[in-house]
Amino acid sequence: MTVTSRVPALIDYLVTLFTNDPTIGAATPPVTVYDGPPVTALNTPLTLYIGLTDPDSDAMESMAESQQTWAALGRRGRDEIVTIHCVAEAWSGSDSVQSQRVAAAGIVAAVETLMQADTTQFGGNILFPDPGMAVVAWSQNTTSTGAIARAAFDLVFKSRIGG
């Protein structure tokens, strides 16, 4: 089978990894992990979106980008740099933005720790994180339903596809 891109398999792997990890999806309290945009209107206090740039958008969102270059003699071997967009979000019914900012930072820290600790090449989908966690944009707000803090970040990987 020809592999056009590692993006779909890598997103699937990350969703499973984060959902089952004791510091994220299996934590107490758990972080709800979404593969892309949520399919429910329910707000969860701690959320990690994989393959999403803006949880508030009703428009189609970019989940990832990839760039390929030739990696070897011949036509088949290519290196692929994959960037997967993610958002960590913490929300509560209280007015304390500070506690939500700390909670969002905790989700990001747990993701970064997993990125550094993986020894499986992320299920065989990559050569290495390049650099792994990159470009974090922090935002916060206090709304009529409570305080919210977000950290939008990119996960960057290098993989080899083809021959």
Could you say what each language-model-derived stretch is?
Residues E61-S62, V97-S99, G163:
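Short, charged, solvent-exposed linker or helix-capping segments at domain edges/interfaces
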Residues L52-D58, E89, A134-V135, V156-K158:
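Generic short beta-strand segments
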Residues R75-I81, E89-A117:
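Extracellular/virion structural assembly segments
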Residues G25-A26, A104-G162:
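Acidic-leaning, charged glycine-interspersed low-complexity segments
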Residues G74-G93, G146-I161:
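Oligomerization/assembly interface segments of phage tail-like spikes and tubes
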Residues M1-S5, Q98-V102, T143-T145:
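Charge-dense, low-complexity intrinsically disordered segments
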Residues M1-L73, F122-D130:
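Small/polar-rich, solvent-exposed N-terminal microdomains that initiate assembly or binding
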